[in-house]
């Protein structure tokens, strides 16, 4: 065999290599996106925490420094109604007292994709728009498509993949439970039934006709090659890029990546997400019933996190990472992208 076994993603999106740089809020921005694009990957900007003006600025910064397709990523979660924060704030009370902060000074919430952001997409006309936690309402989705964007959805089960395919997405991310950050479950499956990536890829590839993008626990060329053999057309890498200098994570977060101990926790946002352990997880345990639903838990935690980080303590904020974190290589993003692709291709061609 010569070349990539499945070129559908490459032909559809127009990248040099079948790699998507994952859109990691607070861990991926303009610098990482530009570096990944210069290496031939699909660069991504995480937009769920941006205002429309901030998105416009970041988009133009990327466009001025790199060529190639660009992905804008949004969340489509349902905002919970009538949730009670009292038990959560009571659990956090000792930390409010320790850091001398007012529990009423909450932080911003991740808001779902809405008409205002859709108008920005129509103005900017990115090549790709991806969504986490299902898809926006049909009218907004059609507007995104009419703006010329390819649409990528995220699925954690075959059922979710079929749901996305029926609504006309152009490619689907197969997110295994090994992945760092928020699990994108949206059809109510039990977290205890979460699927590993290498069980998920072939089942999803058999179930849908669009390209499948493997995500979760892929940390080097061996993982990329294995995902391709199982039926993936591309891979999405997030944790692998956290070791790159373009990633604006804390020194504490970076140091813990090599330890390899990750857990699912709902303490940071109320939604299950995988990351390395910090002080809050160590002291309260990774999952608490008191935490309100996603994304509400983050607002009550925000003043504690802000005060703690000013004091040099980073254990009260998310330090997302996937299970393959120890495989990371501390290389600039462009160089890392090219190396990972070359290593995978060498294995697939029998040279590695």
Language-model segments: residues:
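Active-site entrance/lid segments in N-terminal catalytic domains of soluble metabolic enzymes
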Residues: 1-207, 340
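Conserved active-site-proximal phosphate/metal-binding subdomains
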Residues: 182-187, 191-213, 218-352
